[in-house]
Amino acid sequence: MSLGYAEKLSYREDVGNVGMPEIFDSPELLHKKIEELAVMVRESKHLVVFTGAGISTSSGIPDFRGPKGVWTLQRSGKGVPGASLPFHRAVPTLTHMALVELEKTGRLKFVISQNVDSLHLRSGLPREKLAELHGNSFKEICPSCKKEYLRDFEIETIGLKDTPRRCSDKNCGARLKDTVLDWEDALPPEEMDAAKEQCQTADLVLCLGTSLQITPACNMPLLSLKNGGRVAIVNLQATPKDKKASLVIHGLVDKVIAGVMYMMNLRIPPYIRTDFVQISLRNSVKKKCVRWTLRVTSIHGLRAPLPFLRSVEVSFPERPDMKPVVLKEQPFSLQRETSMNRPFVMLLTFNFSDGCGCSSSSIEWPVDFLKQKDSFVRDRSLVLQELQHAAEHRSRAGQHAILEREGVPRAETSIHALVTNIVRYDTEDSKAAVPMATWMNSNGSLSKRHMDAIGCNPASSKKQKLVATRHRRKGLNPATQKV
């Protein structure tokens, strides 16, 4: 699947230097520089991170100027490269999740990003700690009241154009706009001002995966120098700002950041993705029967896509007289006519799309047309926290929970959260006792065991016993270890 953002950009001949050769520091020099960077981060009182496309390449999203970058291939007449995953299923990288941990510990004060992939927000970085200079392919904004809408699908347009949706505020209702800049669009003042202020305050601006060529954004990190701050750059190519930097590291960003986190004795949290679905059931009485309609839709609107769902299976375990069905086309809808006096249970099985960490998840839905269900709204942040804790503890996706329900005569609607992916980056308890060379491959990439997507199906019982035995010998608790 090609990247919609790159295809939607208007054509521009001059995109700066592309296809620049990649530079790799020797293992010895890289190790030394990582140690130096770890000291700089540890001693920083106001760390600001400035990110570019290079921090997302390990998630399957191509960069722009590298040997296989978007603009490099376009200049050679090869067109836009394909992504290894659908854009909406791209997973935050080790670097994204490390930044989340650095922010939680209070070390990282702010992130300035030139990326539009939404991976910083998807990783869990607080919105107030992020400036997205070039916009976000998954975000809409109301030009009237400035309310932002983060979607689970890619917005159809770029260039600050109108989208098909409107502001949900009852006092507003204005047509929403996309937030992604085209070539001639000016940087959003709110994001720009916040980024400038943070760079001026920073005692260290760490530039990750950016060639620092796009103006005016590329000049922001240097604002820290005026107040005695420092700049560090981690990138595979040389940048125009290298001479101004206190430290320049040529290496894979994930590898460098993994080393920094290791030396600072900080964990890299797993990425746990939660998606949302709305289920509604409406009915009308027809003599002694009830005609009912089931709908499975997006929380972003009846016409909005559900990109994480491939199909929905509807079955009736306690009613062999009711035929099961597989809904394959969105919007997912089922109409039936049944007896009013016979309650039943619907089993809804959500079959997930490619890129999810498990194949499916099922929800039981009791139906009794003679009783009206109660309405409630649960604490969303608490429910999501519990869901994520359960997913991390079990090392698998597929958990679900109801967030809210509205019951009215002849209808009920509920919103459910589903854990659709879990990815671990830092799970080896014995790593601290192992030299760095053994957990970093000689080719410059992280060992596979530090980037492991966990599916829904648990490991075999034989493998679980072997792992548990090994952990007991090491004095570890098998229940908390990844299989």
From Swiss-Prot:
It comes from Oryza sativa subsp. indica. Zn(2+) binds at C142, C145, C167, C172. Disruption phenotype: Enhances histone H3K9 acetylation on transposable elements and promoters of hypersensitive response (HR)-related genes. This leads to increased HR-related gene expression, hydrogen peroxide production, DNA fragmentation, and programmed cell death. NAD(+) binds at residues 53-57, 63-65, 114-117, 209-211, 235-237. Its EC number is 2.3.1.286. It is an enzyme of class 2 (transferase). It comes from the Eukaryota. The active site is at H134 (proton acceptor). It catalyses: N(6)-acetyl-L-lysyl-[protein] + NAD(+) + H2O = 2''-O-acetyl-ADP-D-ribose + nicotinamide + L-lysyl-[protein]. Keywords: Metal-binding, NAD, Nucleus, Transferase, Zinc. Transmembrane segments: none annotated. It is found in: Nucleus. GO terms for molecular function: histone deacetylase activity, NAD-dependent; metal ion binding; NAD+ binding; transcription corepressor activity. GO terms for cellular component: nucleus. PANTHER family: NAD-DEPENDENT PROTEIN DEACYLASE SIRTUIN-5, MITOCHONDRIAL-RELATED (PTHR11085), NAD-DEPENDENT PROTEIN DEACYLASE SIRTUIN-6 (PTHR11085:SF12). This is NAD-dependent protein deacetylase SRT1. The keyword Nucleus applies. GO terms for biological process: negative regulation of transcription by RNA polymerase II. Its cofactor is Zn(2+). Pfam families: SIR2. Binds 1 zinc ion per subunit. NAD-dependent protein deacetylase. Has deacetylase activity towards H3K9Ac. May have a function in the safeguard against genome instability and DNA damage to ensure plant cell growth. May negatively regulate metabolic signal transduction involving methanol and jasmonates during leaf senescence. Required for histone H3K9Ac deacetylation and repression of AP2-1/RSR1 and amylase genes during early seed development. Functions as an epigenetic regulator to repress the expression of glycolytic genes and glycolysis in seedlings. Belongs to the sirtuin family. Class IV subfamily. SUPFAM superfamilies: DHS-like NAD/FAD-binding domain (SSF52467). Residues 27-270 form the Deacetylase sirtuin-type domain.
